[in-house]
A protein has these predicted regions:
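Transmembrane signal-anchor/signal-peptide helices with a preference for the extracytoplasmic
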Residues: 1-18
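Generic secondary-structure boundary/loop-capping signal
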Residues: 4, 39-41, 156
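A generic structural signal for ordered alpha-helices
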Residues: 4-5, 9, 47, 51, ...
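Hydrophobic alpha-helical segments involved in membrane association or supramolecular assembly
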Residues: 5-6, 24-25, 29, 147
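Short extracytoplasmic
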Residues: 16-51
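Signal peptide-directed extracytoplasmic domains
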Residues: 42-67
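Soluble extracytoplasmic domains of inner/organellar membrane proteins
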Residues: 58-59, 63-176
């Protein structure tokens, strides 16, 4: 059979990219499912006049999100998984790489995931600041399949909340020139 003939020419790089694509798909699906609840991660506290005074992050909601994503990833990333590589990549002919019908490869993945949150304030203009909460998912995976041994590291980030805080714009600015 053609696929068995070409399996010996599957490079470690091709196996690594196939595993990487599978992992990214799993991470994106886990994050999307966890975010479907529509939780609010940030609350802006305002003064009686309506001006922003403080920004509060809902740590309980972030911890629930973390637990949901990591739980889903633990279920989907470990064990026997099937990835697909283009048949042309099995021929050893550079011109055909990346083309052709998909040929399934079975990988025995062992993976671990870590999830962290980052919060930052960045300038968004004159007397404006942008508060952003970002989630970073990092996955380290290893395929112990005898024929398709590979190791890969994947990181992806998702912006969970972004709030622009607007203050009063000064009517006049003094510039010091040298």
């Amino acid at each position: 059979m053609f696929s068995e003939w070409g399996l010996g020419s599957v490079s470690e790089e091709l196996t690594q990219e196939a595993a990487r694509g599978y992992i990214l798909s799993c991470v994106n699906q886990a994050v999307e499912e966890a975010l479907e609840e529509g939780s609010t991660f940030v609350q802006v506290e305002r003064s009686e006049g309506g001006e922003p005074m403080a920004v509060h992050t809902d740590t309980a909601a972030l911890n629930r999100l973390r637990a949901q994503v990591l739980s889903k990833l633990e279920k989907t990333l470990n064990g026997s998984v099937t990835v697909k590589v283009p048949a042309g990549s099995l021929t050893g002919i550079a011109l055909l790489n990346g083309h052709g019908f998909p040929v399934p490869l079975t990988l025995r993945l062992e993976a671990s995931a870590d999830l962290s949150f980052h919060t930052e304030f960045v300038s968004a203009g004159i007397n404006q600041s942008c508060h952003r909460v970002t989630m970073l998912v990092a996955v380290q995976a290893y395929s112990q399949s005898k024929r398709f041994e590979t190791q890969t590291h994947v990181e992806t980030s998702t912006v969970l909340a972004e709030t622009v805080l607007v203050g009063d714009v000064p009517e006049m600015a003094l510039l010091e020139t040298g």
